From Swiss-Prot:
The gene is bioB1. SMART domains: BATS (SM00876), Elp3 (SM00729). It catalyses: (4R,5S)-dethiobiotin + (sulfur carrier)-SH + 2 reduced [2Fe-2S]-[ferredoxin] + 2 S-adenosyl-L-methionine = (sulfur carrier)-H + biotin + 2 5'-deoxyadenosine + 2 L-methionine + 2 oxidized [2Fe-2S]-[ferredoxin]. This is Biotin synthase 1. Catalyzes the conversion of dethiobiotin (DTB) to biotin by the insertion of a sulfur atom into dethiobiotin via a radical-based mechanism. Its EC number is 2.8.1.6. The keyword Iron applies. HAMAP family: BioB. GO terms for biological process: biotin biosynthetic process. [4Fe-4S] cluster binds at residues 52, 56, 59. PANTHER family: BIOTIN SYNTHASE, BIOTIN SYNTHASE, MITOCHONDRIAL. NCBIfam families: bioB. Residues 37-256 form the Radical SAM core domain.
């Protein structure tokens, strides 16, 4: 049963279960909704890097922080499509395009829509993350064929003011709702390791699990150490078992959502990734680069999945159970 009325008390109780019991509950729900041996793959491209006016304290692309990231202009459509072809050849099923903006300018919408149409014509699912959107922009992207829109809430409502001041949690949730109402699938998750308390991680998932509809995809990111950003001063490494518990809780609270291991996999052992898959994670980014951070080499992912007896879900098919 899909619920959107979870409470913090319920989530805390689940999170605190003995590890074996938590894993059993998560894996049971995972098998009810997905093929447990199938992994969804996506590739991520920064189509406009740096110079972002937002002050998100974790981000290397903010114009407020001296991180060495140079601002670029929006890529040309053909350059983006060439990258999409390479992503498809490397095994990606979805192509995500990210731009470091507060929100896209109307003058860029024609080019963005051309990118969406071009990537879709290659047989890839399309995803964008461009910041906040107006209802009119949502409608244009939907008409162009955009499948997914990523807009993370990053952390709990209570901790959010500690990491950003130029936009609020309400701004983020409003964008998520605009996207959902506009008929585009929602990709929305958060980041661990920014100095937040365990309670904040749980509250972040409860926030997502009590939306009118659960996100279609829930990315779980580990913060990558970045010189020159405010979060660096209070960032703390995430205990491996704490990560697995959050993945399991995400699977239990949102059983039909794809849970993606996103940024931070370069610092995860094969064993930790395997535990995350067992806990319900069923999507990864492929390719050597995310937006501005590294990602495991393709051969490492292929080797890991092979050793685990897992496989990439067929193109254009989410890793659902056969009955669905």
């Amino acid at each position: 049963m899909i619920r959107t009325d979870w409470t913090m008390a319920e989530a805390w109780a689940i999170h605190a279960l003995p590890f074996a019991d938590l894993m059993h509950r998560a894996q049971t729900l995972h098998r009810a909704h997905f093929d447990p041996n199938a992994i969804e793959t996506a590739s991520l491209l920064s189509i406009k890097t740096g110079g972002c006016p937002e002050d998100c304290g974790y981000c290397s692309q903010s114009a407020h922080h001296d991180t060495g990231v140079k601002a670029t202009k929006l890529m040309g459509t053909e350059e983006v499509l060439a990258a999409a072809r390479r992503a498809k050849a490397s095994g990606a099923q979805r192509f995500c395009m990210g731009a470091a903006w507060r929100s896209p300018k109307d003058r860029d919408m024609d080019k963005l829509c051309d990118m969406v149409r071009g990537v879709a014509e290659l047989g890839l699912e399309t995803c964008m993350t461009l910041g906040m959107l107006s209802p009119e922009q949502v409608a244009r992207l939907k008409a162009a064929g955009l499948d997914f829109y990523n807009h993370n809430i990053d952390t709990s409502p209570e901790y959010y003011a500690q990491i950003a001041s130029t936009r609020t949690m309400e701004n983020r949730l409003d964008t998520v709702e605009q996207v959902r109402k506009g008929g585009i699938k929602v990709c929305c998750g958060g980041i661990l390791g920014m100095g937040e308390a365990e309670e904040d991680r749980i509250a972040m998932l409860v926030t997502l699990a009590t939306l009118p509809a659960h996100p279609d995809s829930v990315p779980v990111n580990l913060w990558n150490e970045i010189e020159g950003v405010p979060v660096q001063a209070r960032a703390q490494a995430v205990d491996p078992f704490a990560l697995v518990r959050i993945v399991a809780l995400a699977r239990i609270l949102m059983p039909a959502s794809v849970v993606r291991l996103s940024a931070g996999r370069t610092g995860m052992s094969d064993e930790l990734q395997a535990l995350c898959f067992l806990a319900g994670a069923n999507s990864i980014f492929v390719g050597d680069q995310l937006l501005t951070t590294g990602n495991p080499a393709a051969w490492k992912d292929q080797d890991l999945l092979s050793r685990l007896g897992m496989h990439i879900a067929p193109a254009q098919a989410r890793p659902r159970v056969a009955a669905e």
